[in-house]
C-alpha cells in the first residue's frame, strides 16, 4: 500500500502516529544527505514489523511530505500502531 507520510526531521524523540489518513513520523536525524530518509525507512520497518527492503519512498524524496510504499494494508497498519 502507498501511504502519505509527513516527516518531522530533527525531532527530540522518535514517534509514529496516524493523523487522519496520513502517517506522521518524527525522526531524530536532520534532513542532510538522506539521513532522515534512511532513518524514516528503518523506523517504519522496525515499528510495523516489515523488512527494510520492502519499504520505499515513492515520492517526496526531498520534501517532508512523502508517499511511502509499505507491504501491509491499512487495517494491519492501524493494528500495529495501536499495539505499540
List each model region and its residues:
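Residue-level signal for inorganic ion chemistry
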Residues: 5, 44, 55
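C-terminal structural segments of small proteins and small subunits
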Residues: 52-84
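Solvent-exposed beta-strand sheet faces enriched in polar/charged residues
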Residues: 6-8, 19, 26, 58
